Amino acid sequence: MGKYERIKLFILIFTLSLISLIVIMINGKTFDLNININDNVKNIEDMEIATGSDNVIKITQKNYSNGILHLKIKSNHKGCSFVEVSSKGHYSINRIFVHEFGIITLDRRLGKCTGDIVVPISILIIITYLLSIKIKHYKKNIEYSSYQYSNISSLGLILFLSSMLVNQIIQISRYNGFAHSIDFLLESVDVFSKNMFPIVILNFILVTVSHFKLLKKEGITWKNMLGVILGFAIIIPSVFPNLVYSFFNNLLHLSLYNEKSIYYHIYLLLKLFSYSIVSYFECILISTVILAYKSATRIPKFDKDYIIILGCMIKKDGTLTPILKNRADRAIEFAKMQREANGKDIIFVPSGGKGMDEIISEGEAIKNYLLEQGISEDKILVENKSKNTYQNIKFSNELIKKRNSNSNIAFSTTNYHVFRAGIIATKQNVKVEGIGAKTKSYFWINAFIREFIATLYSEKKKIIKVFVLITIISMIIVSLSFISAI
């Protein structure tokens, strides 16, 4: 968010806060209390209506129709009182709080008051504004390049804000005071965690099973263990509030059912914080899957002059491994699609140096395969010095620029590698579009998780800001809940 947008956000929050304060101060000195009465009561004279003897409030108007008693209440001075109604088959009592400036709230210190619907509506406007800014930034970044970790973090935040927006709309439709909104939020978080936990467990099982296949094929390494580690990292915060509950309730023998207890609100804070963080991280993980899958399945525009084939390990006899063969075949397939679409030919750039245990360079091995597939040598430009993806892009781009400084470039790699390779190209200001070759599913899952962790690292400053904001909001919400329960 830029400086200008932060200023606009501050002005919006200040303006809405001021409007909310004015609306509540103008309307909050009176309150319309509606009480459902037994149908056997025919008229208001059959009821006994009483208030506290301290003259904190007074009833200025009474009306009874269709089984509902309507009372108009006005504040006299600060304090706490009640409205007691009794009749044949009916008894009710409502606590009334009168605050500074004569503002009346019902039942709880932060209960419903006249005009307070403006508060959740203001929050809805702020969330909508933040969401619109993030969508605008996301679209702008996507237009520049699809391959950026900032796109993942932005989409994750868009998903998170969207869920908040839906939750806020539901709150407004059911609004019954600020305190009840807090209860609804805490209940929503609880329901969300219970609904998501089976999904988290299922994902953990699927990731673990797929990683056993990967470990069997590739061996045990930290990179190959990422999925299992991440599974535990998501499960632990999901069950953490339950562990805290057991600690307070079973070991310390402290009741968490008393809403006035400080321990109850510590538990609420930990639950709200844990589940909010987990839901935010899940939104980032979902956005990682969406963008990585979109990148891998996307077909580049048919305007390409060159297509780089990213190298990887070759066989001992100098022929291509199945993975590298798939990359070359995908490049050939794209060249055919482009030729059929507009007649434009493409130059292949097989890229990859010679490893210590390889008899020829990966670039030369790919070239040999292309020749076998009927590609003419004048359509092949070999890059044979690179040792990694960064150098694949860098050295290939340098060769291309020597021939034509204004070329449209594509690259072919394994589908799970498209997004990461695209990011490496973007960091070098090389404008490219990737196309993905198929591979085993267990490579996909590990790649998604690797990109998720890379996003957390690359966008750590933004994520820490969201982390701090969630912490502050959680503390404010639980503090207000505690104040309201006193």
Task: Give the predicted meaning of each segment.
Residues 289-290, 296-447:
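A structural signal for short, hydrophobic/glycine-enriched beta-strand patches
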Residues 2-32, 97-301, 402-408, 412-486:
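Extended hydrophobic blocks
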Residues 72-74, 414:
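Extracytoplasmic loops/domains of multi-pass membrane proteins
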Residues 39-65:
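Short, solvent-exposed loop/linker segments at beta-strand-coil boundaries, enriched for Pro/Gly
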Residues 88-93:
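Short, exposed coil/turn segments at beta-strand boundaries within extracellular/luminal domains
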Residues 67-71:
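Short strand-edge motifs at loop-to-beta-strand transitions and within beta-strands
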Residues 65, 75-83:
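Glycine-centered tight-turn and secondary-structure capping sites
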Residues 33-39:
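A short, amphipathic beta-strand motif
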